[in-house]
């Protein structure tokens, strides 16, 4: 880690951080959540009734921290400590980071009622508000305020996080979700057009063509895991974003691909319409540069979540915007194959 990072004061111990916010001696209660990284959450209620959430995380707890090569002090904690100025309306809601034994603790206000519900449908005005905030985040050079040695997520590790190759490794390591990912990729291979199944196997085994294409596009600071459950809509117009564990510098295609596929249970419009609404929010012309971003968003999305599309299609689900999951799988497969042809 660079001297610039080490210029920051040492992480305080957790009691010091809690005392700073009037939470010394306040009991913690377990907080149920929908995350699947392994991080642990508790809620604390201060004497004035204000509620807070404490997130404890470490390499030992968190498989994503391990496989993405996170810093031992965790990149999200480094982000909180540097506290970069984010563009309106985006907010980093964290109040501080501390050391708690072998874990890193992050303190934030309790955003219950502000965060969007996990895997629940949203309406179009809500989607527009999220896309406007996302476009603002991507336009601003906020990431340039962080030192060169900031431990950004490696983009190749991010893209390969959920491939069949990765799932095989997780299963062999005894991680329980490895079998679910493998089962999803098996379903994808059964139900997707053969050309799409072959393309996903090819890119999983050798992602260099995709990575090379991404390297040709401009990069910016990304949240990295923009599930709707990580997005809050505050009454004052602010949009707090939590769970920056996989923040990275990469083309917006990486963020858009994951946004489309990870929020399939909540999005009120088909993927092409959402991409076009984002483009307009970002002020991007509908030109060759955008066409390249769009192609790579499709390829990235299917690489990361083809397994889930296989499971959803096999289950016969219907999506909030009206397509069946099988129709959605057909769209993604067709568009990915066409985008893959343009990679050549």
What is each residue range found by the language model?
Residues 150-210:
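Active-site catalytic-loop/activation-segment of kinase and kinase-like phosphoryl-transfer enzymes
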Residues 1-102, 210-214, 234-239, 338-344:
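Conserved NTP-binding catalytic cores of kinases and kinase-like/nucleotidyltransferase enzymes
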Residues 78, 252-284, 299-324:
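Active-site activation/catalytic loop segments of kinase-like enzymes and analogous catalytic loops
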Residues 229-258:
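Catalytic activation segment of kinase domains across protein kinase-like and atypical kinase folds
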Residues 117-157:
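Conserved kinase catalytic-core helix
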């Amino acid at each position: 880690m660079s001297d610039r990072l080490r210029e920051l004061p040492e992480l305080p111990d957790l009691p010091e951080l809690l005392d700073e916010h009037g939470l010394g001696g306040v009991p913690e209660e377990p907080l149920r959540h929908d995350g699947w990284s392994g991080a642990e959450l508790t809620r604390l209620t201060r004497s004035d009734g204000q509620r807070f959430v404490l997130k404890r995380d470490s390499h030992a707890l968190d498989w994503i921290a391990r496989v993405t090569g996170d810093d031992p002090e965790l990149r999200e904690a480094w982000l909180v400590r540097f506290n970069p100025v984010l563009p309106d309306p985006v907010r980093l809601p964290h109040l501080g980071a501390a050391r708690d034994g072998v874990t890193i603790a992050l303190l934030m206000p309790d955003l219950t009622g502000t965060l969007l519900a996990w895997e629940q449908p949203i309406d179009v005005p809500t989607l527009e508000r999220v896309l406007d905030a996302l476009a603002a985040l991507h336009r601003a050079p906020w990431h340039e305020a962080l030192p060169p040695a900031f431990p950004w997520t490696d983009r190749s590790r991010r893209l390969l996080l959920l491939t069949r190759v990765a799932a095989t490794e997780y299963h062999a390591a005894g991680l329980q979700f490895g079998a679910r990912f493998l089962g999803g990729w098996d379903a994808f291979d059964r139900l997707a057009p053969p050309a799409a199944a072959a393309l996903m196997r090819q890119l999983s085994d050798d992602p260099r063509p995709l990575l090379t294409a991404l390297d040709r596009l401009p990069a910016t600071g990304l949240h990295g895991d923009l599930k709707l459950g990580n997005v809050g809509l505050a009454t004052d117009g602010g949009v707090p974003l939590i769970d920056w564990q996989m923040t990275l510098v990469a083309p917006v295609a990486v963020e858009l691909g994951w946004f489309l596929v990870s929020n399939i249970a909540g999005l009120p419009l088909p993927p092409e319409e959402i991409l076009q609404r984002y483009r307009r929010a970002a002020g991007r012309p509908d030109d060759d540069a955008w066409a390249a971003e769009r192609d790579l968003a499709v390829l990235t999305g299917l690489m990361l979540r083809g397994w889930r599309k296989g499971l959803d299609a096999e289950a016969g689900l219907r999506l909030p915007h009206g397509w069946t999951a099988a129709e959605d799988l057909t769209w993604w497969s067709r568009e990915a194959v066409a985008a893959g042809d343009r990679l050549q």
